[in-house]
Structure formats: structure tokens, C-alpha cells
Amino acid sequence: METLKSNKARLEYLINDMRRERNDNDVLVMPSSFEDLWELYRGLANVRPALPVSDEYLAVQDAMLSDLNRQHVTDLKDLKPIKGDNIFVWQGDITTLKIDAIVNAANSRFLGCMQANHDCIDNIIHTKAGVQVRLDCAEIIRQQGRNEGVGKAKITRGYNLPAKYIIHTVGPQIRRLPVSKLNQDLLAKCYLSCLKLADQQSLNHIAFCCISTGVFAFPQDEAAEIAVRTVESYLKETNSTLKVVFNVFTDKDLQLYKEAFNRDAE
């Protein structure tokens, strides 16, 4: 295969490869802009089943994703702690963090979001890491013989992300308010399972997304309180030296986490 030197050419190759795989013989006029090409590629990658993939495809995908991802990297050492020297609150794109592990809010099927171009964290992490993550997750599910339970944690490589690893956890889904004690405990269990797994793997740092607060509808204020309380208790009780980043995306979540730490200091 001729070496593809531009990310635009790589996108076109990957799109054509996935269309061939789907037996899609319709005439396609390739979009002219990189953004439109990316959206087409991402949508196809999102809905692609966890099937074997060629070495050629992986080589092109990895060259493109690693190049795109290294253009936007946030190093943990550039962040300022909010408490002590090991707890951080940071607003930004978790997929840009150069860190030992980021946490993905997965669903029970555990294959990543399969809705084309959906803007949930599960979709974005899988898209930017590469198809290998879906294949790894599928193998985890195959070996355990059932869907992933709420509150557990599993680890995969980060592949093309700046993060070395991805820790996947399934949070509770809220269908009615107020949130039950069971669902509060299950959310806390998500954080505990991720922390324990990180320590078992001898990781130095971990970044949490806001688990269950998206389509799973856990109230953001309650979720922030549970996250902060659970992490602080774990670090204190275990004497863990893990550095923990609470990653937020919205201004509202940033404010809620700051308020949670302010209340904790009172």
C-alpha cells in the first residue's frame, strides 16, 4: 500500500475500506472539507461491529489518530491541584489528557456508543482511541459471558490517546427522582472500582469524567458530591498516592465541583 502522507488521504482510505466492508456500492462523492470527511469517517467507525480488522487499516488509522491527537495534549503536570497535591478539577476534553488512565462512562453492552456521531463521552473516547478499544471490550465481554454490570471497572489500552489506559465503568441509569440509596451507592461503587483497579495496576494518576450525568440522567449536583466524597475517603483510608483529576466539560459541572470542595473544607 502506498504510504498516505496526509490525514485527508488517510480519512478517504479508511472511509472507502469501511464502505467495502459493508458492501456499500453506492456512488459516493467524497466531501471536500476535512471536517465533513471526519464526520463521515467517525459515523462509519461508530457503527462498525467488533469484527477483525486488517493490519493495513490499523496502520492508516493509527497514523491519522496519533497525529491528530498529539496536536491537542494537556499534561497533568500543567494542572493546579484543588486540594493537597493530588486532587485536581479540570475543565476540558478528557481525550487530550496525557495521564496514566482516563475513565470512560460505558454502557452495559460495553462496545462503545454505536450511534453515529453521538457526542457522549463513550463515543468520543472510542473514536479518538481507535477501533482496537471496541475489539478489546468485545473480548472482555466474550470471556465473561455476559454484559457488564453496574459499578464494576475494566481496563484497556489507550492506543492512540495521550492516556496510556482507559478504565471503563458502567454507571447507574436514573429513571425517577429522587435518586434511590441503591443508585447513590452504585455510583460510589463506580468510583471505588476504578480507583482500586488503578492501584492494582500500579498507575500513578487517573482522570474521571462525570459518570452517569449525561444520558444516564444522574443529577449533576448529587453526582459531584458522591464523586468527591468517595475519592477523598478512598485516598485517606488506603493511603493511596494516586493523583486524581475530576474532569468536567460544562461550566455548570465546574461550579458544582468547586462548591463540593468548598463545602468539604468548611
Curated annotation (Swiss-Prot):
Sequence positions that bind ADP-D-ribose: 93-94, 107, 120-122, 212-214, 216
Top-tier EC class: hydrolase
EC number: 3.2.1.-
InterPro entries to which the protein is assigned, alphabetical: Macro_dom, Macro_dom-like
Pfam families: Macro
UniProt xrefs under NCBIfam families: PRK04143.1
Protein name: Protein-ADP-ribose hydrolase
